């Protein structure tokens, strides 16, 4: 920074004025967004290798204008002029699946297998941005995922006059990455939010496992090299997605996959507000992520049996601790059950109100 500033001063340019020309990346600038940025900055400055993962939103939340004294929200088109700091990495693209149903079969060795069929899919393409450590030679990566259609345009449907069907795949992909926190007071909004969360989680976990396998043969030792830090409940579906990959793609048994997963996932909850402890309707979750729901259902069954064994007559405790209860999938409970480290970060004002 110092060298660049001195060079620009000699040329008669103001570095601060140049910095103001760069639009803020609309990737999440609320509390969790700032926290994630601080995590990456600190990890880089301390010399720890790390990846941060998220979605490459086209419009972020919104740009603010004041009209007649009132706030007016407009799309924040931060990518209008491109982003010179990002590098598109299509060679690391992966496929993310939604919907359909799960078919199971037993092979000749009596091992059960699960296959997702009749699904919709999108192509997750990573864009990498450098996160430079302070006064050292460490550069980590912020990997943000863009969604692209598997099939760009269906000419047959277009020729039949079904113009919406012709661009259905394109719209499915575009909607995932349009805005941060789409309105979820209706079913379509809830579905889109869950799609967003699973999209970037699935892409990121697939990427991490593939990177590990390039240099290591034994997937059972994944925890020796990889840790997934889950900030709040948004990425906690990581637990079930990692189980899916380990069992369905890498051939591990349930117990082997669970042993790896519970050593790889760490969870931090940054608020105890009810709206931040995400719950998803079971019918939505089951429809959109059928295999993931099956895995969560089995995690819940095993965990509830353990709770019943320890507290046989305490139905209230079982109801509070269960992952699936009252028609809801409780994501914080999932993360706590599966995480090898679970923390609650509470601000000082909250502590003073007697919550600890």
Protein language model annotation of sequence segments:
Residues 1-13, 135-227:
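Function-dense linear segments that define catalytic or interfacial modules
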Residues 2-41:
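Well-ordered mid-protein domain cores that form the structural environment of catalytic cofactors
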Residues 17-27, 180-196, 219-231, 239-248, ...:
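Glycine- and acidic
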Residues 40-64, 253-273:
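Glycine-rich phosphate/pyrophosphate-binding loops
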Residues 60-142, 314-325:
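Extended, Lys/Arg-enriched charged tracts that mediate electrostatic binding to polyanionic substrates
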Residues 239, 243-301:
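Extended, well-ordered alpha-helical scaffold/bundle regions in very large, multi-domain proteins
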Residues 280, 284-287, 291-340:
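Polar, glycine-rich mid-to-C-terminal structural blocks
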Residues 344-350, 354-355:
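Residue-level detector of conserved catalytic or cofactor/ligand-binding positions
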């Amino acid at each position: 920074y110092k060298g660049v500033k001195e060079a620009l001063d000699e040329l008669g340019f103001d570095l601060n004025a140049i910095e103001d020309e760069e639009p803020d990346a609309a990737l999440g600038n609320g509390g969790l967004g700032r926290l994630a940025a601080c995590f990456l900055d600190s990890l880089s400055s301390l010399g720890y290798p790390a990846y941060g993962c998220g979605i490459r939103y086209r419009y972020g939340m919104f740009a603010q204008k004041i009209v007649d004294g009132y706030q007016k929200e407009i799309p924040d088109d931060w990518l209008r002029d491109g982003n010179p700091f990002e590098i598109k990495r299509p060679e690391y693209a992966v496929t993310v699946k939604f919907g359909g149903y799960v078919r199971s079969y037993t092979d000749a060795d009596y091992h059960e297998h699960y296959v997702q069929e009749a699904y919709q899919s999108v192509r997750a393409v990573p864009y990498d941005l450098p996160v430079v450590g302070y006064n050292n030679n460490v550069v980590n990566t912020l990997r943000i995922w863009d969604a692209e259609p598997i099939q760009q345009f269906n000419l047959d449907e277009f020729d039949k006059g079904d113009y919406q069907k012709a661009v259905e795949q394109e719209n499915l992909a575009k909607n995932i990455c349009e805005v941060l926190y789409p309105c979820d007071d209706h079913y379509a909004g809830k579905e889109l939010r869950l799609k967003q969360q699973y999209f970037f989680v699935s892409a990121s976990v697939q990427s991490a496992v593939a990177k590990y396998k390039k240099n290591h043969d034994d997937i059972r030792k994944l925890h020796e090299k990889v840790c997934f830090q889950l900030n709040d409940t948004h990425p906690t579906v990581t637990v079930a997605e990692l189980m899916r990959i380990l069992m369905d793609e890498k051939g591990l048994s349930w117990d082997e996959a669970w042993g790896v997963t519970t050593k790889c996932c760490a969870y931090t909850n940054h608020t105890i507000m009810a709206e931040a402890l995400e719950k998803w309707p079971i019918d939505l979750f089951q429809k959109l992520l059928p295999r993931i729901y099956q895995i969560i259902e089995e995690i819940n069954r095993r965990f509830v049996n353990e709770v019943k064994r320890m507290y046989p007559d305490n139905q209230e405790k079982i109801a509070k601790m269960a992952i699936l209860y009252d028609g809801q999938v409780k994501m914080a409970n999932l993360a706590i059950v599966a995480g090898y480290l679970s923390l609650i970060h509470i601000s000082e004002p909250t502590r003073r109100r007697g919550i600890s």
